Amino acid sequence: MITKIDSLPKDLIRKVENGEKLLPNQEIVYFEEKTVPYKIRSDEESFPLGKLITLLVTSQSFILFDEEQNSGWKIPYETITLHAKQSKDKPYVYVQLEGEAIRPLLDHILKFERSSGTLHEAPSTEDENEFTDDFLELTLYVTDVDSCYQALCTCQSLHPDTFSSDNDVENASMGNPMSLFFDPNHQWVTAENVDTSACDNRFDSPESPVLKWHRTE
């Protein structure tokens, strides 16, 4: 489940010395960047460009935090169904969240000030429309796109989707042709990355992520 936080975790490990032993529950920072502009889109609404947030990719979770508001979210990797990058034009990292576990974040977004697109909460109203699907897209305009994307690849591989893994085994045993479009790390295989590594998904055109990437589940 996505967790709302009012401060960044204080026990984050930002540097690991050679030979240092770590406990399984310790949270290692693989990527960190402050003042990241972002955009949010649900299945029904697209919000304006948001103000700056702190982004952390750790061994345990994907963290978005607004230091001005002392408010943020710890997002488990199991809720991330797709991540990709665009390296041309205006570079960004794209993250797609899906599933019932993201409901707290979706409900919170309904209280955003839509006129400014910030993380400031606006008073709730009785006639607010509910989201029809637990689906959310994040576009993060990080400075170092490659490092952020690689960190996401690494950390998400530490938290494999058990349900998807079971489906992959079943698809392979049944000869399902759709299994040919996934690699073992659950990355989308396209014409752009078929001859490259599993973590080489990217947007290199101005096309919308929704148009360029198609889900098959």
Swiss-Prot record:
Location in the cell: Nucleus; Cytoplasm
Gene3D superfamilies: Pleckstrin-homology domain (PH domain)/Phosphotyrosine-binding domain (PTB)
Keywords: Cytoplasm, mRNA processing, mRNA splicing, Nucleus
InterPro entries: ICln/Lot5/Saf5, PH-like_dom_sf
Record carries keyword Lipid biosynthesis: no
Disruption phenotype: Decreases cellular levels of Sm-class snRNPs and leads to abnormal splicing of a subset of introns. Decreases vegetative cell population growth and leads to heat sensitivity.
Matching Pfam families: Voldacs
GO biological process, one term: mRNA cis splicing, via spliceosome
Record-stated family: Belongs to the pICln (TC 1.A.47) family.
Function in brief: Chaperone that regulates the assembly of spliceosomal U1, U2, U4 and U5 small nuclear ribonucleoproteins (snRNPs), the building blocks of the spliceosome, and thereby plays an important role in the splicing of cellular pre-mRNAs. Most spliceosomal snRNPs contain a common set of Sm proteins smb1, smd1, smd2, smd3, sme1, smf1 and smg1 that assemble in a heptameric protein ring on the Sm site of the small nuclear RNA to form the core snRNP.
Annotated protein name in UniProt: Splicing factor saf5
Record lineage: Eukaryota, Fungi, Dikarya, Ascomycota, Taphrinomycotina
